[in-house]
Design a protein with these regions (language model features):
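C-terminal subdomains that position terminal phosphate/3'-OH groups for nucleotidyl transfer/ligation
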Residues: 79, 85-199
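Basic- and aromatic-enriched surface patches that contact anionic nucleotides/nucleic acids
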Residues: 1-106, 176-177, 183-184, 191, ...
Length: 199
């Protein structure tokens, strides 16, 4: 034991969050490795964002429509993805989605206006309900919408596109009257193996 070498990492309070994420990812080996959202939860557990995402994901409509387990925080990531795009609706200036969500998690902690948070949750839940009106029950944001042989595995890219775009529709009643035309074109996009949704 006297000759055993230990490697320790000391993270100061002023250490930038990006460095903390980097260190956490480097030492996140062995056993059951944490996924990216679990790391965000761990590094921001004292922040408002963690509680807010939990509040969204415990909503009965969210649980019913998204239909994904909260065991590995994937539901929290989905809620965060929607919020990230709503808070950053300008040009995407990030190298990857992970960095985008890391920063968005921090930005979420900075929102002090409770009405803003209430509105974000309301917008997501209403959008999820609208997605059921358009796509049908139990669509689960999966490619099985267009390819019946596919299992109903949630596709994150589909979730992003559907929720963010549907949330921006101003006249939803008019859109509902045109939903068959939308579905025809949307299914063609999903069936295209070159599209982002094929991944």
């Amino acid at each position: 034991i006297d000759d055993t070498e230990f490697i320790t990492y000391q993270i100061e309070a002023q250490t930038p969050k990006k460095v903390r994420y980097s260190i956490f990812n480097r030492i996140n080996t062995g056993g059951l490795s944490l996924n990216e959202q679990e790391i965000r939860q761990a590094l921001n557990q004292e922040g408002l964002g963690v509680k807010f995402l939990e509040n969204i994901c415990s909503d009965p409509n969210f649980k019913k429509i998204v239909g994904i387990s909260s065991k590995r925080m994937i539901d929290r990531e989905l809620a965060l993805r929607f919020i990230a795009f709503k808070l950053n609706n300008k040009e995407f200036n990030f190298n990857n989605m992970s960095d985008f969500l890391d920063e968005s998690m921090e930005n979420l902690d900075q929102i002090k206006n409770e009405n803003k948070l209430i509105e974000l949750k309301k917008e997501l839940i209403e959008t999820l309900i609208f997605s059921e009106d358009i796509l049908g029950e139990k669509h689960r944001f999966s490619r099985s919408l267009a390819i019946k042989t596919k299992t109903k595995t949630l596709n994150r890219s589909l979730f992003d596109v559907i929720t963010v775009c549907f949330s921006r529709i101003e006249n939803k009643n008019l859109f509902l009257t045109k939903k068959e035309l939308f579905l025809k074109n949307f299914i063609e996009i999903i069936q295209d193996e070159r599209s982002e949704f094929s991944k």
